[in-house]
């Protein structure tokens, strides 16, 4: 069995297990208890100074989740970086860079390969025009970012809630429509840490009725109302001519007689498919493993007139000649929308003395 298929089968098993407290989850519960104790001890070591957290010379904002898999961190990180730039800050972004080939800090340049720096950091760099650096050691990466870009006055860590060695000033925890799953810790459930874990802000990617979260959290909605040909997106997205864009209403009319395939190699493909259905499109679905590398062309034998992919997948597809030149492939960029009051709270915290 191919490795990607094995991974996909294992992912499906755990998705089913983590959705409810069934037999498989109960059998794994003792391991969750051990995991919970070890995780709590680690947090306490940093809280009481037994293990030392490294503080940067600028404030650090961590955007992350405790639910395994994708919850929409990248759109939120992009929104946050753009919001801070508009407020007069000079943000820089650090990330682990899933799939990155180097363990040492590495700058994400416009011509970087996704397999070298990771798909999400490459997308963040394209969308925000902020300095982005990746590496396994968040402290070393943050230090390298500040050394290379001394104008940076706030660091955004894309993921890394559990990387306690990097001291942080603001924590933003993100959930999506899956809520807490069955509410148990790994491996019986999908949670890396308890929901009661301390944080500054809780954001839900989706509607309140889709989650079991409390009502006082901050709502985030993703909108993708445009589609653009992959062949026209070799430049940074902000440089793509507006004539290359088509609204979903136009796409729906123009594509309705055709066979449409929607493909997504993200943590929660159903979120992408639901977004397209809400736009009135009818299509076949191709869920791919998270961070699918697109080294091979999964669409070569597909009988479809139009193939819709996520923006995160597009940064990898552009680096495959067959995919980049396939006129059937269209990209659906998404934009995060959050309440202005949330942006004001973040800016106020950064400008105040509470995180000095």
UniProtKB/Swiss-Prot annotation:
Coiled coil: none
Signal peptide: none
Reaction catalysed by this enzyme: a lipid A disaccharide + ATP = a lipid IVA + ADP + H(+)
Domain of life: Bacteria
EC number: 2.7.1.130
Residues annotated to bind ATP: 67-74
Keyword Amino-acid biosynthesis: no
Enzyme class: transferase
GO terms under cellular component: plasma membrane
SUPFAM superfamilies membership: P-loop containing nucleoside triphosphate hydrolases
Pathway membership, UniProt: Glycolipid biosynthesis; lipid IV(A) biosynthesis; lipid IV(A) from (3R)-3-hydroxytetradecanoyl-[acyl-carrier-protein] and UDP-N-acetyl-alpha-D-glucosamine: step 6/6
Record key words, sorted: ATP-binding, Kinase, Lipid A biosynthesis, Lipid biosynthesis, Lipid metabolism, Nucleotide-binding, Transferase
Family: Belongs to the LpxK family.
Function, as annotated: Transfers the gamma-phosphate of ATP to the 4'-position of a tetraacyldisaccharide 1-phosphate intermediate (termed DS-1-P) to form tetraacyldisaccharide 1,4'-bis-phosphate (lipid IVA).
Name of the protein: Tetraacyldisaccharide 4'-kinase
């Amino acid at each position: 069995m191919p490795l990607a298929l094995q991974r996909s089968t294992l992912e499906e098993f755990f998705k089913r297990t983590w959705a409810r407290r069934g037999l498989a989850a109960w059998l794994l519960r003792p391991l969750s208890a051990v995991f919970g104790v070890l995780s709590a001890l680690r947090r306490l070591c940093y809280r009481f100074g037994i293990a030392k957290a490294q503080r940067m010379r600028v404030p650090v904002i961590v955007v992350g989740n405790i639910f395994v898999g994708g919850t929409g961190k990248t759109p939120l990180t992009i929104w946050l970086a753009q919001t801070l730039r508009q407020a007069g800050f000079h943000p820089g972004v650090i990330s682990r860079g899933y799939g990155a080939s180097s363990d040492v800090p590495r700058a994400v340049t416009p011509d970087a390969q996704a397999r070298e720096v990771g798909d999400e950091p490459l997308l963040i760099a394209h969308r925000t025009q902020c300095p982005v650096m990746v590496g396994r050691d968040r402290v070393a990466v943050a230090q390298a970012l500040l050394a290379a870009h001394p104008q940076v006055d706030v660091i955004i860590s894309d993921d890394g809630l559990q990387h306690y060695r990097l001291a942080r000033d603001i924590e933003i925890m993100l959930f999506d429509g899956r809520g807490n799953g069955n509410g148990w810790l790994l491996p019986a459930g999908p949670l890396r840490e308890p929901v009661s874990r301390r944080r500054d802000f809780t954001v839900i990617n989706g509607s309140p009725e889709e989650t079991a979260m409390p009502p006082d959290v901050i709502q985030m909605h993703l909108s993708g109302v445009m589609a653009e040909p992959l062949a026209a997106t070799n430049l940074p997205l902000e440089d793509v001519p507006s004539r290359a864009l088509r609204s979903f209403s136009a796409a729906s009319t123009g594509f309705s007689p055709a066979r449409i395939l929607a493909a997504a190699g993200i943590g929660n493909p159903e979120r992408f498919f639901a977004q397209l259905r809400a736009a009135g499109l009818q299509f076949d679905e191709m869920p791919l493993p998270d961070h699918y590398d697109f080294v091979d062309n999964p669409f070569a034998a597909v009988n479809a007139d139009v193939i819709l992919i996520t923006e995160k997948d597009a940064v990898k597809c552009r680096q495959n000649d067959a995919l980049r030149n396939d006129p059937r492939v269209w990209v659906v960029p998404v934009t995060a929308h959050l309440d202005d009051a949330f942006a004001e709270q973040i800016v106020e915290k950064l400008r105040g003395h509470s995180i000095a």
